[in-house]
Amino acid sequence: AEAEEISLSDIQEGDIVSITLDEDGNAASITVMSMEMDGQGQSGGDEQGAPGQGGPGGQSQGVDSYTAVNEYIEDTTISNETIESTGTDENAALISSGANVTLDNDTITRTSADSQGGDNSSFYGVGAAVLATDGTAYVKDGSVTTDAAGGAGLFAYGDGTVYASGTTVKTTQDTSGGVHVAGGGTLYGWDLDVETNGESSAAIRSDRGGGTMVIDGGNYVSNGVGSPAIYSTADIAVSNASLTANGSEAVCIEGLNSIHLYDCDLTGNMSDLDQNDNTWTVILYQSMSGDSEVGNSTFQMDGGSLTSENGGVFYTTNTESTITLNNVDINYNDDNEFFLQCTGNTNQRGWGQSGVNGA
């Protein structure tokens, strides 16, 4: 979309304002994301939905091409339709070539017994139901359901941006995040209902290359082992939402990345696993996998509640970290081991070199 001039009177309560700063700290662009979800977000600068600066980690060349049931390369609106994908490692809807595509009250399904999942799905969105790589997807109401390895629900990669409002997202298999960014992608969500059931399938998920996620309202549940409510290798802000991990820690932040929570109810129930030194509810760490840049991990929570169903509360290892809490109701489990543990680790998970991987 072309840049337009707007005034303060054009901004309504509930809109999200994104400001990108230049090297001198001056505003280079200002983008207003309207809660109306009409696909007409107005920008006062050169870019719309500019990606954030989550720690990028190791960058790679991406995939040569994608396979999709429907690839949208021009502006269009699809309303009240069913989009089905049953192919191996394919997308149901792929938005590219700078297209602005509105998916309004559609039923989108992705089912495959032969899909592989893995890094191509986590890093680039191969096999996601809805994938925006170069363009903007406006997803309003409707549902997105996947039963395939690597079957993320909504995925923004690279120059892709996803706006989603009132949509139900449910994924079943492994490596299938609910809403997902990587490679600098951008995703904004309002009042979503997200549930994941596989391993490595955070309800709110990011991976190599980082990006920006801003979410307001809704319910986000992960049920799998190794599937937090939020997994951050990006800059992620969530407000007024319920965030629950039934088989994992509630939050995982890796490296130079951040999570900011405002008036959220956050719950974690991490499984006891032999490969871990102990059990926690929020972890800030550096895995050394190359998925995130080394640096300070930031967790901020303002208002709301934090409930630990198993193990300690905050655990940080092999990284610098900043944890800020303000007016948060903290609920401990009966066997709580610690509130905060800053420590090295035995390196069973490959998190740095034992003896020099403290926090």
List PLM regions with ranges.
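Residue-level detector of short, conserved catalytic/binding motifs and their immediate flanks
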Residues: 91, 152, 177
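Generic N-terminal leader segments that precede the first folded domain
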Residues: 55, 85-86, 106-108
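Short, flexible, surface-exposed loop segments at domain boundaries
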Residues: 1-58
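Surface-exposed loop/turn motifs in large extracellular/passenger domains
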Residues: 61-80, 95-114, 125-146, 151, ...
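Feature marking well-ordered beta-strand scaffolds used for ligand recognition
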Residues: 117-121
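Beta-strand-rich domains and repeat architectures in extracellular enzymes and scaffolds
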Residues: 83-97
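Short, surface-exposed beta-edge/turn micro-motifs
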Residues: 13-16, 90, 127
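Aromatic-rich beta-strand patches that line glycan-recognition/binding surfaces
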Residues: 340
